[in-house]
Amino acid sequence: MFDGNPGRRRLVLASGSPRRREMIAGLGCEFSIASADIDESVRPSEAAADYVERLAKEKATAVFEARGDQQDIVVLGADTTVVAGGDILGKPVDFDDAKAMLRRLSGTWHEVLTSVALVAAEGCKVTTTLSRVRFRELSEQEIQRYWDSGEPADKAGAYGIQGLAGSFVERVEGSYSSIVGLPLCETVVLLKEFGIKIWSD
C-alpha cells in the first residue's frame, strides 16, 4: 500500500491502554501515544464485528484528523469486545454489572473480537480477529474477590485474560494476543504494509 520512504513514517498509537502500549513496544516499533475521545456506545442492531471495526476506525481517524503532520504519520486504533450469546459485553459500569457479566461467562464459551485499524494519508485499512474462550465455573466469592482486585473495571467483558482472570480460563481457540487486546501477527502485516519498521527490519 505504501510506496514512499518508510524511514520517515512515524507510528501513533490511538489508545491509552497500557496493554496495547506494551505490545506495540514489544514489536520494536518507535511510536507516540495520543488517546482518542469517541463515543463507544453500541448502535441499535449493530453486529459485534461491525462495532469493533467501527470503533477501531473512529479512534484512529479522530487522532489522525487532529494532527498537522498527516503526511508523516500512521495512526493505529484498536478495539476489543466480548460477545456472549450474541450480546456485546462492554466495560462494566459497576460491581453488579461486572458480576452479571462474569456469571454469564462462567462455565461457558464466549467470543472475543479485536479490530485493528491503520489510518494514513493514503487511506485506512482494518483487520478483525475472532477468538473463543471457555471459562470454568466461577464461585460468587471468586467474582467478588476479582472485582475487589480492581482488574475488571476497565475491561470488556469484565476480565483481562493476562491477569488474575487467566485462572478462569479452561481453553482458548484463536489468538491469545488478540484476546489481550492486539492481534500481533495481523498487526505486523498491517504495519509493514504502511511502511512502519518493526524489530526484524
UniProtKB/Swiss-Prot annotation:
Gene Ontology biological-process annotations: nucleotide metabolic process
InterPro entries associated with the record: ITPase-like_fam, Maf-like
Uppermost EC category: hydrolase
Active site, renumbered: D79 (proton acceptor)
Annotated PANTHER family: BIFUNCTIONAL DTTP/UTP PYROPHOSPHATASE/METHYLTRANSFERASE PROTEIN-RELATED, BIFUNCTIONAL DTTP_UTP PYROPHOSPHATASE_METHYLTRANSFERASE PROTEIN-RELATED
Family, as annotated: Belongs to the Maf family. YhdE subfamily.
Protein name: dTTP/UTP pyrophosphatase
